[in-house]
């Protein structure tokens, strides 16, 4: 999929356009996703008209939004690339697994790009004041056009990078669980870090996790035949701003444990690692675009399996933070691994962002189109709202507070319980559980159970992992 800037419309090439009143950004994303989903041949878009109508004349911002949303709609999972040995070669196969159509999208941007205009032909006698004035004016206009062109080109390239990295995350989510175990994702991360000098990587496996005291990660994984892992990535930005930690839930498959899911409930549980995939690929995006801010990432990888070694109802585990947790529900495992990862990340970060397919309660409240989020600081919440509005990602802030927190304090044998007998307000109770482990840092938690996965085709995105919230978090990292 190519994007090419042109000054004039190309004859015979279909033009993508819209009708009706100016939509909000979320509706606009749906429209552009639909364009990308239907692409079968070359097309063109009048970038300046689009920017004037939708982005208050900010053509470079219009280009960014258009390109990444088109790539989101155009993605298809390349199932033909799967086969024997593919799980060991996912990094090498990723462009065959994350497929885009072989088409060219012409972005029509009619600025002269610094070429001569009629006024460049200098009038009047050499050295006259009028000629000098015209030359200064023309030079200013020329420089302005060149700067505008450079700005648009820069934003198109950033958007292409965002779209590519997001589609890699979707590809990881779409992989069958037997093609993407914790071992396989560790190997993928090693190859990624080897290709990206700006990224450093540490991988902690079970021996190190035991020494660290990561009881949440180890407890959830103890029935699995594959070792748990904690991926720790770092990116050093050129700026002096706060260090942001990204934390992504990586349950490679979730059976529910002893509290075994039904067949319907277990469907799609390979997607329970979409948060981990998003975080890993957001780190790649930051490295590729030279993000100004410094980042760290903590990505716990487990399988919530069931056998005689599984966590049991009533078991007490000791977390990385030193706090103890009674396991009341083995299918509330995501918060256990995130708690260890958040405590780990809080040691070196100034603010925390976690992404997780965490609770069905959030999906029941908000549906499949809107992501719920929790935040413990107003300034960060305002930044989240701006980033999501600009990216066209519908979100809704859900409450935290003592009325929900006290539902975690009933255990006689531990500091906290991971679940509550009263199942109401489950998303807020889960958010309060996570907040116990952020060590007072500014923190936002995205609960993406509904939007992260599309259960059936909708004419805008392919069924499967959607990459929702990726663009919004990418914008948040630039704040």
Predicted feature locations:
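A generic structural signal for tightly packed, nonpolar segments enriched in small/aliphatic residues
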Residues: 1-13, 140, 186-479
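Short amphipathic alpha-helical segment within the helicase RecA-like ATPase core
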Residues: 1-243, 247-250
């Amino acid at each position: 999929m190519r994007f090419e800037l042109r000054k004039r419309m190309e004859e015979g090439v279909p033009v993508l356009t819209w009708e009706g009143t100016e939509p909000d950004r979320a509706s606009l994303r749906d429209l552009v996703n639909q364009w990308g989903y239907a692409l079968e041949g070359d097309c063109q878009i009048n970038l300046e008209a689009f920017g004037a109508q939708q982005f208050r004349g900010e053509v470079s911002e219009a280009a960014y939004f258009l390109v990444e949303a088109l790539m989101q709609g155009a993605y298809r999972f390349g199932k033909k690339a799967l086969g024997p040995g593919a799980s060991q070669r996912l990094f090498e196969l990723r462009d065959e697994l994350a497929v885009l159509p072989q088409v060219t999208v012409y972005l029509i941007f009619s600025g002269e790009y610094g070429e001569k205009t009629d006024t460049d032909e200098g009038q009047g006698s050499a050295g006259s004041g009028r000629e000098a004035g015209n030359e200064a004016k023309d030079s200013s206009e020329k420089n302005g056009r060149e700067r505008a062109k450079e700005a648009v080109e820069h934003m198109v390239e950033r958007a292409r990078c965002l779209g590519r990295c997001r589609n890699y995350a979707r590809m990881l989510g779409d992989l069958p669980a037997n093609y993407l175990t914790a071992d396989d994702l560790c190997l993928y991360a090693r190859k990624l870090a080897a290709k990206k000098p700006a990224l450093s990587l540490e991988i902690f496996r079970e021996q190190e996790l035991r020494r660290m005291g990561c009881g949440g990660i180890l407890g959830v994984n103890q029935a699995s035949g594959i070792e748990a892992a904690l991926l720790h990535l770092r990116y050093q930005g050129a700026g002096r701003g706060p260090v942001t930690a990204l934390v992504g839930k990586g349950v490679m498959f979730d059976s529910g444990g002893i509290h075994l899911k039904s067949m319907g409930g277990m469907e799609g549980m390979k997607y329970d690692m979409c948060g981990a995939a998003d975080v890993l690929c957001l780190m790649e995006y930051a490295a590729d675009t030279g993000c100004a801010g410094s980042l760290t990432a903590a990505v716990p990888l487990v399988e919530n399996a069931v056998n005689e070694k599984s966590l049991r109802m009533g078991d007490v585990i000791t977390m990385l933070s030193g706090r103890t947790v009674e396991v009341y529900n083995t299918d509330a495992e995501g918060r256990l691994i995130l708690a260890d990862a958040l405590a780990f990340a809080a040691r070196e970060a100034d603010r925390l962002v976690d992404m997780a397919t965490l609770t069905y309660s959030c999906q029941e409240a908000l549906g499949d189109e809107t992501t719920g989020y929790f935040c413990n600081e107003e300034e960060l919440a305002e930044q989240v709202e701006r980033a999501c509005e600009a990216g066209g990602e519908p979100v809704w802030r859900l409450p935290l507070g003592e009325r929900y927190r006290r539902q975690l304090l009933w255990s006689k044998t531990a500091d906290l319980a991971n679940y509550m007998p009263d199942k109401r307000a489950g998303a807020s109770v889960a958010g309060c559980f996570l907040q116990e482990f952020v060590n007072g840092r500014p923190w936002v938690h995205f609960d993406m159970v509904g939007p992260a996965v599309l259960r059936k085709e909708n004419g805008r995105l392919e069924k499967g992992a959607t990459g929702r919230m990726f663009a919004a978090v990418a914008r948040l990292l630039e704040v």
